[in-house]
Amino acid sequence: MKADNDLYRQLRELPAAQLWNVEVPKFDQLGPKERNQQVALVRAVGVVFTTSRNPEMKAAVKAWMISLLQDPSEKIRRYATAAIPKLGGDEESERKLIDILKTTDVDREKKKVASALEKIGGAATLKAVAGSGEKLIDEQKVRASVARQGGPSNVRLDAIVPKQPGLRLHLRCRKGLESIVADEVREDEGRGGKFRVVEVRGCFVVVEPKDAFTLAELYQLRCFDTAAFSLAFIREPGSAEALEVLAKAIASPLTEKLMLALTQGAARYRLSMVSEGNHDDAVAKVTKKAFELNPRVLNDARESPWSVDVHFDELRALVELRPRISPNPRLYYRTDAVNAASHPPLAACLVRVAGRQDKEIVWDPFCGSGLELIESALAGGVGQIVGTDIDPAAIAIAEANFKAAKLTGTKAAFHTADFRDIIRIPELDRGKVSLVISNPPLGRRVRVPNMHGLFTDLFKIASEVLRPNGRLVFINPLRLSSVDPTLRLESSRTVDLGGYDCRLEVYRKR
């Protein structure tokens, strides 16, 4: 085995052309014993050509692998079997693998063939499984493979979810932002929105639909991170019965009804245990049991449009059905991002906390890709946005994002500049800016020298440019407050930004 691995590593380093034009012909001319000794070549070729962008070359490699399925050596057949799914299965490879499954007496070859058929199998594999009662092949995986072959599946934003008693959704967010998310829902309800706040909990807000709705209507709300349908609460998630309860929740009529109604293409889900540790064994048991209970609800970890998320706390687990929506319809304007860019819902939360004034002039001193500025303009009432950043690449991205947002009623100016050089920025007249808003460098993903000095200067400059009653709204990673008497701290809340706490603060200019 060690010799095979050493040879494989050597062959992996060779150019693809040399592997195919030199090493493969040499391998084909060898006798049975020598071919077995050089079997690592089959593995190397399979891996190297998996990413080939030459369709003719890839097809030729796959044809060679299929021919090896008839080799007298079980080891060579097994290596070729492992390579075929990486190259893309077809009816010919499926047929030959089924033939091997029916004829071989070697257990490890049976297992390898079964694994390959689970990845590329189609109707012929399903028929073979049904006819033979073959237990090595996971029927659910084959059905998922067949579904993928039928084309991509997507969550439909325009599909109507009928009103039904007891239906709840969880709007998840970063810890500390729950009240902002809830306030947005309540305000939207006051304008005729379709959702009502039921409960505010740690990291999520429970809402119920007041009427039939679409996900497009839900995604008009901008402050939540992800949305999911509540499926079940599991008490004592560590108990032996917990996996059974979880499987029943996945296989339930509610899950099936939601997935079928809201999916274009085959409805499939992946199961995610949102906690530390390895949960592979539990996931396998639950998805198998759920399929036994309801074979119309398919598990597919590879390309599923839905995720069943299990969130744990000390006493229970929450089971949610989350649509995997990509791209996010709220970020239609996001053409690109920068390193350490703002978390988009956090930008929307900053804007909401800031409130609105007439004819706003909004400045982000560290604008990055421009999310806070664009979210401010989307909220309305903004006449001018100004973005500064020392990185010219960030400024280019911010300009492109603003253009994509199509905010024709708002003027925009972006400058590659240090925020302290306000004299170079004509749009920043002293005492004219109504809102300074930013998620500034926090010193985590991007190192920032003299953080204390940076934020001291931010307070000073904000005081200079803000008009009376103007606001400074930002994320503060330091235990540092303004000493400027013209800036009054109006609110401060602790927010978890991925393992470390910061403060979302609002200062108002006297």
Where are these regions (language model features)?
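Class I S-adenosyl-L-methionine-dependent methyltransferase catalytic core
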Residues: 2-189, 313-510
